[in-house]
């Protein structure tokens, strides 16, 4: 238990200092512990995934994202589900990205921001598939139903403007 506490502290410290190598090393060591509570395992997967993505290794990070995305009730899982779909989209796997987002919509999450980001991503997916009408409908619905004061409104506005310009 003391070892787990020490590894957790080292991982968090490395993360906060932006030490990518150490964050990955400590998270990996923590995940190797046999008596790790699920919350700490999720935190370790999250920090490792985010660090690997920042290092330009999204394919390696995807393994952690898949684990986290199984539980969208947590903040880590909610973000991971979105990031996984975004990674598929960026990798040119449009159908896989669409499937991931549609699955996210079905299982839902209490973390509205990540679900809203997923709807924006779905509109990008549909534009890429040539389904501009579907993309517009999702954006308009999101614009009407999502009221938080964050960057989502700007994303919706810019995408709708682009769609209107292409008509």
State where each predicted segment sits.
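Acidic, polar-rich low-complexity tracts and alpha-helical solenoid repeat scaffolds
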Residues: 1-167
């Amino acid at each position: 238990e003391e070892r787990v506490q020490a590894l957790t502290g080292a991982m968090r410290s490395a993360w906060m200092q932006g030490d990518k190598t150490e964050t990955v090393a400590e998270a990996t060591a923590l995940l190797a512990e046999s008596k790790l509570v699920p919350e700490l395992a999720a935190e370790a997967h999250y920090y490792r995934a985010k660090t690997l993505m920042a290092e330009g290794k999204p394919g390696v990070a995807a393994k952690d994202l898949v684990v986290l995305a199984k539980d969208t009730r947590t903040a880590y899982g909610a973000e991971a589900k979105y990031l996984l779909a975004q990674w598929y989209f960026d990798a040119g796997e449009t159908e896989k990205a669409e499937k991931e987002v549609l699955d996210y919509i079905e299982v839902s999450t209490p973390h509205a921001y990540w679900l809203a980001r997923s709807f924006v991503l779905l509109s990008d997916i549909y534009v890429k598939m040539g389904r501009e009408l579907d993309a517009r409908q999702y954006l308009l619905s999101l614009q009407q139903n999502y009221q938080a004061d964050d960057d989502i409104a700007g994303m919706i506005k810019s995408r709708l403007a682009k769609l209107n310009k292409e008509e």
